[in-house]
Amino acid sequence: MKKTLYQKLYDSHIVYEEKSQSPILYIDLHLVHEVTSPQAFFSLCSKNRVVRQPKKTFATMDHNVSTIDRNIDSSGLLAKKQMEALIKNCTKFNIKLFDLNHPHQGIVHVIGPEQGITLPGMTIVCGDSHTSTHGAFGALAFGIGTSEVEHVLATQTLKQNRLKSMHIKINGDIDIGITAKDIILFVIKQLGVSRGLGYVIEFSGEIVSKLSMESRMTLCNMSIEMGAKSGIIAPDSVTFSYLCNRKYVPKGKNWNLAIDYWKTLKSDTGAIFDQEFNIDISNLSPQVTWGTNPSQVISINDTIPHLESYSDPIERRSAELSLLYMGLEPGMSLIDVNIQKVFIGSCTNSRIEDLRAVAKIVMNKRVCNSVHAIIVPGSGMVKMQAEKEGLDKIFKNSGFEWRYSGCSMCLAMNDDRLNNKERCASTSNRNFEGRQGRGGRTHLVSPVMAAAAAIFGRFVDVRTIYNSLDK
């Protein structure tokens, strides 16, 4: 039987299956952070159970850490208690922890790949919905709830229903200044936020094959915003080059054996997908969200759609409420909208490739006086590399705050957040009401679009900046 990549990964990890029951899958890698793990560890200890395979469990502090300093007290008492609990639990069960003072601390979905902990062919889980990021390596990676975190800690397995397979081919030619963030926002606009329910999405096509691993991670990171369980991309030479010589990858002969196996991780020719979509992005422009879900997005030179354009009454009502919350009106151009804050960071867009692109845009320019702009590297390694290249000096000279690593303003769980009705150009992945702070208004954009917005104090087509750089 010809199989999709998802089916291959799923079937190869079944350890027990009984008729009319969800199969039990073996989990190769369990990633843990401070927010969704305390209850799981507490329940585990109350039942006198242990972590079954601590060497396949890695932990970090990211969600509620302060990125202003490395003080465990900076984000409040609850955050401090959660971080202290993680230290205690990792010490007790001998789990590798990248804590606040570890040079490799960072966002869980950044440090896994950059350390070579994430590998093709794995099943990977974490108590975080954007675990789908790791699917860029040809891994079956998905978020789980706290009770499931406990189950994986105790058994290294998890009950999982079989899902359907969706195939999205992305083809065409892209203009300078168009990024993976623009691509995935456009895909979400075309397919909607619920099209992926019950599916794992495999991305392919000539565009995907040309993307770096950082960009592929952005695609898979936001597959969850279509309602999918995960996104996945078959590993190839780009994947292998990225992983080569990273700390936790196989070494010596084992590396060659791993490559041989990883090359088999692709959908069979003729494998049947439950849904397939071909998306041409040849004329794609930079994307900016205007509403309160990622599908409410337009090209920078377009205007916000009129409510009459929605045939579905539910979508029309959703758009109406989104505009009310965002303080916008149908027919408006986002180029006319001023912003107060810029956030460049998150597990979607905080890697070294993102920061290099931002530096090119802001070099020898100044952040608008009315804008508070922060750049938050995704990990200690990203921060060190950026500083080695002098990017931090470019950012600071331009008026950006250069921070320590963490999730920061992606979510209102730490000391970085929006105030009521503050408008933010953000490189994160969700623009829900209150996501970045109560009453805060989030516009999702690429790193270079966010950088340009910081300079001008409003949204602009970043391609005009690229064109001026070429002259």
UniProtKB/Swiss-Prot annotation:
Sample GO molecular function, one term: metal ion binding
Co-factor: note: Binds 1 [4Fe-4S] cluster per subunit.
Gene3D superfamilies for the chain: Aconitase, domain 3
Keyword Transferase annotated: no
Pfam families, per database record: Aconitase
Record key words, sorted: 4Fe-4S, Amino-acid biosynthesis, Branched-chain amino acid biosynthesis, Iron, Iron-sulfur, Leucine biosynthesis, Lyase, Metal-binding
EC numbers on record: 4.2.1.33
SUPFAM superfamilies: Aconitase iron-sulfur domain
CDD domains listed in its UniProt record: IPMI
Signal sequence interval, chain numbering: none
Catalyzed chemical reaction(s): (2R,3S)-3-isopropylmalate = (2S)-2-isopropylmalate
Domain of life: Bacteria
UniProt family annotation: Belongs to the aconitase/IPM isomerase family. LeuC type 1 subfamily.
HAMAP family found in the cross-reference section: LeuC_type1
Function summary: Catalyzes the isomerization between 2-isopropylmalate and 3-isopropylmalate, via the formation of 2-isopropylmaleate.
Subunit architecture: Heterodimer of LeuC and LeuD.
Protein name per its UniProtKB record: 3-isopropylmalate dehydratase large subunit
Organism of origin: Buchnera aphidicola subsp. Baizongia pistaciae (strain Bp)
